[in-house]
Amino acid sequence: MQKIRNIAIIAHVDHGKTTLVDKMLMAGHLFRDNQSTGELMLDNNDLERERGITILSKNVSINYNGYKINIIDTPGHSDFGGEVERVLNMADGCLLLVDAFEGPMPQTRFVLQKAIQMGLKPVVVINKVDKPNCRPEEVNEMVFDLMFNLDATEEQLDFPTIYGSAKQGWMSEDWQKPTDNIIPLLDAIIKYIPEPQVLEGMPQMLITSLDYSSYVGRIAIGRVHRGELREGMEIGLCKKDGTVVKQRIKELHTFEGMGRKKVESVKSGDICALVGIEGFEIGDTVTDPNNPEPLQRIAIDEPTMSMVFTINDSPFFGKDGKYVTSRHIAERLERELDKNLALRVKKDPNEDVWTVYGRGVLHLSVLIETMRREGYELQVGQPQVIVKEIDGQKCEPVELMTVNVPEEYSSKIIDMVTRRRGELVSMNTQNDRIQMEFHIPSRGIIGLRTNVLTASAGEAIMSHQFLEYQPWKGDIERRTNGSLIAMEGGTAFAYAIDKLQDRGRFFIFPQEEVYAGQVVGENAKDNDIVVNVTKSKKLTNMRASGADDKARIIPPVVFSLEEALEYIKADEYVEVTPNHMRMRKIILDELERKRANR
């Protein structure tokens, strides 16, 4: 019987957890020396690498001194809250990874809180001690305070701390004495993290995660809670409504390195993947068909935000996408529901419109961005928060937001947040920076990030996470400027843009194709105006001498997907295609728009 340790890794964005796992895989001699591997083997989807965030949790395992260590990488961002809880269910302990300079960050707190409630035993790793002016001792104190505030037990507070640098590939129990390998970390894992309890009896396994392969369909992943599962055995699947469906396990796989290994049986305490089970949901229990005993289901965080998805019906429809019809989009959203748990989709019976519910703008924009790269064309409406009735009161989601800025900008930021119905909860100074915590309605966060960065000259570090539902806070002012709208379709000319510069700022480059009703810029005043950007210089006027030789154009504002979603108004869509992103009015024709506004 192999000895097993199941650990989850908890860390803030960019504190180096994926790099650390790479090094642990190296230490477990997973790769032959001649096999060159890329950096960041875990974040294997392009989007994750670009943003440096882990979206989906993944499992890998390493063998060390006859122990099998299952490592579960958790997403750090609370927009993927549904992922976090399930993942922690498979672990017996956790590695809390903290940056030696920044200390524990708010998003770490979110995952850590869940881990402590589940009673996992932590091992703290203070990473990046090779950086200049880091402060490992202070950070260790901060971690202790944080755990204390999260109501950790005495046993949890008595945690071991390992210092090191994942990038340079060393870990040590004392940060002033660097070593040349990460063995001390592996030893600490084996010494401090409890082994899984082995329970004899009828088999039980809670399905906590799933994988999808076009070859065998959906694959259930979970940790065997009790007994053992064998290939080809009959099992009962306990559903949400209490019914039990008899099924048979076709194949069993355990995790071995980055891949999987087919095995005949899996004993309790190990993590495995089952092939051949149909129609299961996350939270169902695999158990004995004759006297089923379901395990307690996991609650997955409710969505707090919704957006409208619809087919692209702009004049440039189908120019650069492969999948453009409503059937394609419907199928793609169905497929996403298989993997993405915190997502809900509701179809409008009359039109090709879907309302997609998710955990926040980040969660939904990751989905849109993924679809865009796969060659889909679609349009998305303004993000709306989900309002609930609680005890007859209208309630809205409120988030805990932390902003870290240099001292001189703090008053500006406080002013900006309180205008959006946020309230300052705490404030403390570290050197010349100030860390502030606010409670702010989710509505107020939409579109806030760009403003905060502008006001603080790009210095602010901002992160937020869902807190709870609170009574409705009243109206919030959104962007007050109107839009500049293209009058007719065609190519935008520098000559026309130059003449219109004093009207506002533009979002388009000269020589770009535009269509009537497209939002091409932001008006300096608060009303929408229709401008003609397709006007070129008349031929007869070419030789007239004058000061109009050069058009001097201020460079246009370029939006990322999230910024565009946060920027648009309720009567606008973002049109997303594989090569372009445009903003447009929902009603393209000017006369019809005026009629609708009356």
Give short role names for the model-derived ranges.
Residues P292, I300-D432, R443-I445:
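Charged, conformationally dynamic linker/hinge segments
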Residues H225-E351, R373, P555:
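Catalytic P-loop NTP-binding/switch module of NTPases
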Residues H15, A27, F31, H77-S78, ...:
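Conserved nucleotide-binding/hydrolysis micro-motifs of P-loop NTPases
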Residues M1-V98, E102, M142, L210-S213:
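P-loop NTPase switch module centered on the Walker A-proximal segment
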